């Protein structure tokens, strides 16, 4: 094990000098430095660049407070490796695989795997055309998710990405019954804590591994924690042949952490100040999140959109890798429609008659047509009023508004805030409900009866309570 000495510390970036005759550590190798003489407080560094003349530049996975020039640094000879397998289920740990749930740490002999790996080769890949039912009407109808597919939840600040991902965990992890891996990347610690206790209460935690590198962590940890979660998911897929659900909240923070580190590594910034290696880093992560002939990984990723600008390089780069996109729209939150999913901007390659069936496809496309026409008529209504519309257009507007409200739904995870019980709506019920609205069966019911309900029967009950 070769050793060197700290030459420079600049925030999370540490330069290490190795003696001229020593073998330099390889890129992505983990180095260890002890802050105290008792060797109790260690910091893990990851090699990012070789600068020449025996100097390497590293990124710290923990705070560099207390590091001084001249401290000894040891090369472990391998990449950061984390625990994998059944022992990780029901546990919470950090980027290095150290437990943070106040329970017993992992045994020394637990299986470990390096976080840096190659993506599966082309001939190992497998595709599926099976739909993953979420129980959320707007998603199941207009942008259905594929088993083994990649899903992106796009939205600006405060539009409901984390609540939606928590509802998906509640619905899918409980219905799916398989193994789930939740990776918190640079998000709020409070949300992670709430999620942990909710999962513990519901019993879902027994089949879930949770990995966190939250907002308060240094950028090195936030940059690598997604790979830690992915390594655990890959083990369940490849070694145990399982179908795995991988939740990542938030993939933008992965890019943001890379951007923070990039300038300190001496790279010239690219568009909007992002790192020049943005597309490569995103590709290396996303290409590993895939399904093989041994098992599948269905990934659901929350993606923050800075200033609601979808042309920003970070969300735009992520778009290219996804099968389904669920776009959250701020205007809908202002109208009190939750989940605030934009039915026209969201898309899925699964929405085709071959995959979802003729009836589902016909109802979904008609819903989109009606909503698109309503959007076009809104300018006329705003300027001239409803009276200028033809009878046919007035009927269409009425149905479009009912559809828009019926796309909203109460969530189980939001019950403590709204006081309203959450609902899980099977796909067949969703399709039937929208088909009947399009046929005009409920034109006589008030629009408010369609707001924040589950299946169409809830609308009828709500309307009866309102005196209709």
UniProtKB/Swiss-Prot annotation:
It is an enzyme of class 7 (translocase). PROSITE patterns: ATPASE_ALPHA_BETA (PS00152). It is a peripheral membrane protein. GO terms for molecular function: ATP binding; ATP hydrolysis activity; proton-transporting ATP synthase activity, rotational mechanism. ATP binds at residues 155-162. It catalyses: ATP + H2O + 4 H(+)(in) = ADP + phosphate + 5 H(+)(out). Pfam families: ATP-synt_ab, ATP-synt_ab_N, ATP-synt_VA_C. Its main location: membrane. InterPro entries: AAA+_ATPase, ATP-synt_VA_C, ATP_synth_F1_bsu, ATPase_a/bsu_AS, ATPase_alpha/beta_chains, ATPase_F1/V1/A1_a/bsu_N, ATPase_F1/V1/A1_a/bsu_N_sf, ATPase_F1/V1/A1_a/bsu_nucl-bd. GO terms for cellular component: plasma membrane; proton-transporting ATP synthase complex. Its EC number is 7.1.2.2. Keywords: ATP synthesis, ATP-binding, Cell membrane, CF(1), Hydrogen ion transport, Ion transport, Membrane, Nucleotide-binding, Translocase, Transport. Transmembrane segments: none annotated. It is found in: Cell membrane. Belongs to the ATPase alpha/beta chains family. Produces ATP from ADP in the presence of a proton gradient across the membrane. The catalytic sites are hosted primarily by the beta subunits. NCBIfam families: atpD. F-type ATPases have 2 components, CF(1) - the catalytic core - and CF(0) - the membrane proton channel. CF(1) has five subunits: alpha(3), beta(3), gamma(1), delta(1), epsilon(1). CF(0) has three main subunits: a(1), b(2) and c(9-12). The alpha and beta chains form an alternating ring which encloses part of the gamma chain. CF(1) is attached to CF(0) by a central stalk formed by the gamma and epsilon chains, while a peripheral stalk is formed by the delta and b chains. PANTHER family: ATP SYNTHASE (PTHR15184), ATP SYNTHASE SUBUNIT BETA, MITOCHONDRIAL (PTHR15184:SF71). This is ATP synthase subunit beta. It comes from Streptococcus pyogenes serotype M4 (strain MGAS10750). The lineage of its organism: Bacteria, Bacillati, Bacillota, Bacilli, Lactobacillales.
